[in-house]
């Protein structure tokens, strides 16, 4: 990756488990969730910190009930955990997509990510995190 040049490689990782809301009263569980995200990110990312505007996509795949988690409460702990591991500062996150996907429903998986396919085969809750270059404005839905 060439930091600051727009030429970094797309980053992705899988975080096993159910996300903990940023609004959780159980601060220890929230801290543990952020640590899980950091560990997964460190295992998948060996490049220098990204120092340019980025696109962050967080997809929560779950079985059964999603726990009533709001998208913004899923996003915040993940974004906080990636800061200082993948990207320098969260102000670099210019575009965000958060998706909740119930594994009990039939759906087409719009990905060629081997990591996602392998995680789906386990039929357990997980979060797929992607950090990528900003798309051209006209290319974004």
Residue ranges of model-derived segments:
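Acidic, proline/glycine-enriched N-terminal capping motif
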Residues: 1-141
